[in-house]
Amino acid sequence: MAEGAELIQKFYDETLSNGNMDAIDDLVTDDVVDHEEGLPGQPEGKEGVRFFVSMMREAFSDLKATVGPAVESGDMASAEVTITGRHTGEFMGVPATDKSFEIKSIDIVRFEDGKCAEHWGVTDNMALMMQIGAIPEPAQT
């Protein structure tokens, strides 16, 4: 795995899977810019990263992220990420359902001195909401 993809995997392992909030200081710049649409109430910058990780860990257990195919160019890396977990706490007004989920996301990260300085992302939130039972799955024809 290339260096940028390794840093993306390390971020997910340390924060989302292990709950190591101190790792955010080691892996994210103080003035990080996140271009992905945030969760309701999510602040900007590094505090927004902490908010995201905390909210996800409060709502889901057994969180695991696996970095798949990745490409790198200069100070940037892009990776497909598979995220799995179980819905064991309230998430955006949806009470815990104890349902498991598996979703995909794409992360594009610009690094400065080995830290995430800028992030663009797309996450399949529709699949997440369907899998935890918040919205119905489409009818099969």
State each model region's role.
Residues 1-141:
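C-terminal and inter-domain tail/linker signature
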